Amino acid sequence: MELTVRSILKQTVLPDEIVIADDGSGEETKKAIERLQRECILPIIHVWHPDEGFQRTVIMNKAIARANGEYILQVDGDVLLARNFVKDHLELAEKNHFVCGSRILLEPKITEKILKKEKFPPPFWKMPLGFVLNSLRSRILRRYMAKRYARSIGHMRGCNMAFWKEDVIKVNGYNEDLLQWGHEDSEFAYRMHFAGIEKKALKGGGCVYHLYHKQAPRDNEERHNQELSKVISGKVKWCENGIDKYITKKDK
């Protein structure tokens, strides 16, 4: 998480604030965030709830509700942002659209070097072959691919998304009935699509570098698949158990 924040502070265009969605971390993380709050030139809002297992959808809704900005760039706490990440995302920002960016999955050895404070980002020739394109930056490519590479609505990277807060409220945010890993971002994206909010793809810039770690358990993936299928077949726009319980009057 700390490396993620520090990569935000090195952006060519800085965001207005940083909101940390903390799904039950302990005292060590709290102290790290307090240190960053003292050092950082940007406001850092720490949104925390107790550890009751994997509850990403819940903490994401709470964090989005606390965000003061109209346009939200969403990343995970295990990624590092390319220096022009914010700039490239803002270039594609458009009303009634949400954006899905790309990630580069770093191998264990490269991750280890980065954690030792060695050079970041790694040169593209050290990237896994399939991710070389994601490491390249081109305005022409970004604009050309934005609506041509959007692929399926459900092809999402929750570690690299952008959306308008009013659109999140329109579909009631993340579905908090999905409490384990798997397809929660796709379910959210399909509801936005059925509400008339279209997907754009960010290629040729705005990538994140995903630090290597073991994948989370996928125990509930089948049930989440079933929920996703219901949303698609029923063209569902709204989830009942969502962000509305955290939204204040000023956001409505």
What are these regions (language model features)?
Residues D76-L80:
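The conserved acidic donor/metal-binding loop of glycosyltransferases
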Residues L14, D22-A32, G53:
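A conserved acidic beta->alpha catalytic loop
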Residues K119-I153:
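Short, flexible, basic/aromatic active-site loop/helix in glycosyltransferases
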Residues N84-F124:
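Conserved donor NDP-sugar-binding/catalytic core segment of glycosyltransferases
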Residues H155-M156, N160-N172, L179-E198, K203-G204:
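A short, conserved alpha-helix in the catalytic core of glycosyltransferases
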Residues P50-A67, N84:
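Glycine-rich, basic loop-to-helix element that forms the pyrophosphate-binding segment
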Residues I72:
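Short aromatic/hydrophobic "clamp" motif used to bind/position activated sugar donors
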Residues R6-P15:
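Short, acidic, metal-binding catalytic loop of nucleotide-sugar glycosyltransferases
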